[in-house]
Amino acid sequence: MDGNMKRVLVIGGGGYCGSLLVPQLLDEGWDVTVYDILVWYGSAHLPTGNPKLRIIQGDVRDAAQIALACVGQDSVLHLACISNDASFELDERLSTSVNLESFEPVVIAAKKAGVKRFIFASSSSVYGVSDSPDVTEDHPLMPLTLYNKYKGMCEPLLSKHTDENFVGVIFRPATVCGYAPRQRLDLSVNILTNHAVNKRKITVFGGSQLRPNLHVQDYADLCKLLLAAPDEKIANQIFNCGFQNLSIMDIAKVVKKVVEEEFPENGSIPIEITSSDDLRSYHINSSKIKRALGFEPKHSVEDAVRGLCEAFRQGKLPDSFDDDRYYNVRTMKAVGAE
């Protein structure tokens, strides 16, 4: 991308990943507009005093407001959705309108406004269940839930509008983990770490399911790379982005090891196993993004657990079981999904 093109609209920029990414974009000289409904923390976790940051509180389904937000932007980074199956299933009509029906109008608005690049955060969960040893981007999509299905359905809705003046790129991130200012504690690594630190035990649901993982800082680094990469390297491309394909039980063992090292005064952390109806299991291959863009993760699941331990130690995550803001489904219930 032209080095002079440094204006980006981050839709969903107030969320878990956006809260870490946005300050870094500002530090790197971007003019950033965050468009977000801001029902979790408001804008308190964003650097509101930075003159290069503009925050628009809005609904992604509001086509007119989205169109105005796109004016003057060089790039759009679309991170917004009702995230995870439990939140989605609270109100399928609402979730369908947000996660699927609003998507193409946003793409059309961006193109009409003269945006040059559109980056969409899909999900590696579009693969559902696969016994393939390496799931590449060409693997058939076999989503198990509507949340995952709609992520996959949005991808061609972007691709059909791209051309030489409107570059589209899609990435399929793995389950994200680690500390960010707008913290989530309803994701696998983060859940297990919270329980290990604060309940001094780990409960594993199932255990054999394979899951790829992605540190939230690597997620942010990937977004920055996709914003800066030359058009010819990313145009109409889909990239897996998930590393450390671990079973849920192996994740639990990593969490146990790290938490016992970080909090030796708490003694041994037991692992308890219970049944699960979450059948998602897949081992993704992310070599394409390494070949095309040289992207490799710099952070591990162990790093994510250590970062969370430090956040707990510093009191950055108070009331980690009772504060609804850490849990998407509970926040949606609290504000009244409609």
Give residue ranges: language-model regions:
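N-terminal Rossmann/SDR dinucleotide-binding element
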Residues: D2-S75
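Active-site helix of classical SDR
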Residues: Y150
